[in-house]
Regions:
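Clamp-loader machinery-focused feature within the broader ASCE/P-loop NTPase space
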Residues: 1-152
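Charged, glycine-rich active-site and insertion segments that engage polyanionic ligands
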Residues: 1-61, 166-169, 175-334
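Conserved strand-to-helix beginnings and helix N-cap segments that scaffold or border functional pockets
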Residues: 151-155, 321
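Residues immediately C-terminal
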Residues: 148-149, 163, 179
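Conserved catalytic/switch belt of AAA+ P-loop NTPases
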Residues: 130, 155-169
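Loop/turn-to-beta-strand initiation segments
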Residues: 136-140, 165-171
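Conserved adenine-binding aromatic site and its adjacent loop/helix in ATP-hydrolyzing domains
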Residues: 127, 159, 182, 186
């Protein structure tokens, strides 16, 4: 499992069991296994063999996987656990969508899945946390990604963090903790989740059937789950097409993209290529596995920033062909 690549972080979490805080904030780059760690720790807290498990030492402590608590958690229906995340994230992870409140079904039937955690979700969570535990133990709530909250939702969570119900445990998972309210961060014990050791991550990818794992790991910036997504998903196919176009020098073809779904992968590849060109100029090294071709570092860094902005713009209505052509045309010549 991916959490095996984060043994040191898992050991840190186990070290907090004796004096468990009411809120943890696991933060790090996307794709390093933060959610897997959060879910595994939540499962451990709900494991009905946990009393004997907690007396073991070292990284071998883990949920038993066979008790009712573990089986319910793994099936996604433990009565004392909640995962609070945007509808779009739940859909991408093949989880059941949050149950609509009365009167909400008709309003949401024809709308796109939300990309934010809704205020209704935190209110429902507050109701859940104020009930007695079904199994006589803790109640655990995972927020993922925690930064995907608007101001009203964040303030609702803050209220629960300021006055946590007895035996309630909050686990926040964040790719960008700076986007959280400072008052939320200050009420959590922060646990940084680093990039795994590259050789171990490449070996894990190879075990998942990924070909050329080092290449995909480099392109993903060292994040193994992102590398797995690139190597096995539709996004990876789009990235491959862009990489082949760049390798062949056929940049004009990249500007002929007509499908909106290929715009963000194009912007991502161009951004990472630009960063590699800048890094090569400054240090002779690259970060994302691109060719170490030096150039005007300032120009390539400016282009990388522009592509970062374009990655956000690709979610909005626009002309795919025109937008792609503009991105390619703006590439530095040196």
């Amino acid at each position: 499992m991916i959490s095996n690549l984060q043994k040191e972080t898992w050991a840190q979490l186990l070290g907090k069991l004796d004096r468990l805080p009411h809120a943890l904030l696991l933060h790090g780059a996307p794709g390093v296994g933060k959610l897997a760690l959060a879910e595994r720790f939540a499962q451990l807290l709900l494991c009905e063999q946990r009393i004997s498990a907690f007396h073991h030492e070292g990284q071998g402590v883990a949920p038993c996987g066979t008790c009712d608590g573990c089986r319910w958690f793994l099936a996604g229906n433990h009565p004392d656990a909640r995962i609070v995340e945007p509808e779009a994230v739940a859909l991408a992870l093949a989880r059941p969508a949050p149950v609509a409140e009365e009167g909400e079904e008709e309003k949401t039937k024809d709308t796109k899945p939300s990309i934010q955690i809704k205020i209704e979700q935190t209110r429902a969570l507050a109701d859940f946390l104020n009930l007695a535990s079904h199994r006589g133990g803790r109640r655990v709530a995972i927020f993922h990604p925690a930064e995907d909250m608007n101001t009203a939702t964040a303030n609702s969570l803050l209220k629960s963090l300021e006055e946590p119900p007895p035996d309630a445990m909050f686990i926040l998972v964040s790719h960008r903790p700076a986007r959280l309210l400072p008052t939320i961060r200050s009420r959590c014990v922060q646990v940084p989740v680093p990039l795994p050791e590259p050789k171990a991550a490449a070996a894990w990818l190879a075990a998942q059937g990924v070909r050329a794992p080092e290449r995909w790991l480099a392109f993903a910036g060292g994040a193994p789950l992102r590398a797995l997504d690139y190597a096995t998903g539709e996004r990876g196919e789009a990235v491959e097409r862009v990489l082949r176009g760049i390798a062949s020098g056929n940049l004009a073809a990249l500007g002929e993209i007509k499908e909106r779904d290929e715009l963000e992968p194009l912007a991502e590849v161009l951004q990472k290529m630009a960063l590699d060109r800048a890094f090569a100029s400054l240090s002779g090294r690259t970060k994302y596995g691109g060719a170490a071709v030096p150039g005007d570092a300032r120009a390539w860094l400016a282009y990388a920033r522009a592509m970062g902005r374009n990655r956000a713009l690709t979610r909005h209505p626009l002309n795919p062909k025109l937008f792609a052509a503009e991105m390619v045309a703006g590439m530095p010549k040196t």
